[in-house]
Regions:
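Short, aromatic/His-centered strand-loop micro-motif at the edge of beta-sheets
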Residues: 108-132
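Hydrophobic secretory-pathway targeting helix
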Residues: 1-25
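Secretory/extracellular carbohydrate-interaction modules
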Residues: 21-109
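C-terminal membrane-anchoring or membrane-association module
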Residues: 211-224
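Flexible glycan-contacting loops in extracellular carbohydrate-active proteins
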Residues: 152-192
């Protein structure tokens, strides 16, 4: 019930911002539906797919993971690649039930390389719950909400322009399929906030969702 209220709150807030999209030339938008079978590969065999637009300055990625996992060790991992620096990427990983592990990693070529910034071995995300949101600006860095709360705040990744993505889900090539059905949808919006103040709205909203869920949880505990 708590998560449903958060989703309703999110929907009511986001609709006015996007309603102005057709008349707003400063917005760049990508909506991507990824076939579930694309996750049944190891990372080295994943295909890098270019986005329709290069997202710069200020962007937000909303991830709706409605995949049905095929085994407890299966994962759904998405990497976002930088336009300016080869092999620089952000990684979001979502594990299967019952653990629902979750992690965020960054790969910076040369030094320091691949670094896991935060990880949750249990209850890291909620299948069927609120979406996962990545929000970035050149000045504020990267903030991630796992659908329950903010789990990474203002990480300095220098400039990061989204140009492409890849997905994978198997740890080893001999492992069984990670995913057997379902949907994985990403909505990406970007632009320059100095030209369009409405672009600040999704980032403020992402923080509000985490706060709302926390307040509702505390209220529920006190009333029970």
């Amino acid at each position: 019930m708590i998560l449903k209220l958060a989703v309703i709150f999110f929907s009511l807030g986001i609709i006015p911002a996007f309603a102005q999209e057709p008349s707003n030339p400063t917005l760049e938008i990508d909506s991507i539906s990824i076939p579930h079978a694309d996750f049944n590969v190891v990372s080295r065999d994943s295909k890098i797919v270019p986005l329709n637009e290069i997202h710069v300055v200020s962007w937000q990625v909303t991830i709706h993971n409605e995949l049905m996992y095929a085994n407890p060790n299966g994962n759904a991992v998405v990497r976002f690649y930088d336009y300016n620096i080869e092999d620089k990427f952000l990684e979001i990983g979502m594990g299967s039930k019952p653990d629902n592990k979750f992690w965020i990693a960054v790969n910076l070529p040369d030094d320091p390389g691949y670094v896991v910034m935060t990880t949750y071995d249990e209850r890291g995300w909620v299948p069927g719950g609120a979406p996962i949101i990545l929000a970035y600006t050149d000045r504020a860095g990267l903030t991630v909400n796992n659908g329950q709360r903010i789990v990474l705040s203002n990480l300095d990744v220098e400039t990061f322009a989204l140009k492409s993505y890849s997905v994978w889900g198997k740890e080893g090539s001999q492992d069984p399929p990670a995913i057997h059905s379902g949907m994985f949808v990403m909505d990406i919006i970007s632009g320059n906030p100095t030209e369009n103040p409405l672009l600040f709205f999704p980032y403020v909203l992402a923080a509000c969702i985490g706060g709302l869920v926390a307040i509702l949880l505390v209220t529920k505990k006190r009333s029970s």
